[in-house]
Amino acid sequence: MRIVSLGGLEEIGRNMTVFEYGGKLLIVDCGVLFPEEHHPGVDLILPDFSYLRDRLNDIVGVVLTHGHEDHIGGVPYLLKERSDIPLISAKLTLAFIKTKLQEHRITAKTVQVKEGDRKKFGPFDLEFLAVNHSIPDGMAVAIRTGAGLVLATGDFKMDQFPLDGRITDLAGFARLGEEG
């Protein structure tokens, strides 16, 4: 398995990671970076899609871990490259995305998941786990392939008493750790 970050490392924002296996690509998050004062006239900064342009037809889906702009803000721009890429996420995150896509006049294929769900997209077997964050409905995704297991957590916090009662699934994280 090859893992390529297209944004989000050593910066706060533009989160986007590509997982490659068996000739197929799975993307986790597709966010924007908000410019600072040394970027006058710039509204937002996108991940660099050039790595994907020759392989758009190999993308099996985009998993969105939660609804913050630094994780979902680039989705309309990716879908302008290929509009039928499935967007995979929790109910609230998909609601945010649908509203954002309406502004761009894009209709997306969406797949709603919840914690505990397992879904297969190409060679990727995905398992979704609850995470707590400053926005409801956050999820981590365990990505299984013939090469092994990777856990992509997105952003999360360790709050044992969140307002919505939904805590990070530490038992699930431990189980995945035992699995390897």
What are the residue ranges of the model-derived segments?
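His/Asp/Glu-rich metal-coordinating catalytic cores
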Residues: 1-63, 68-180
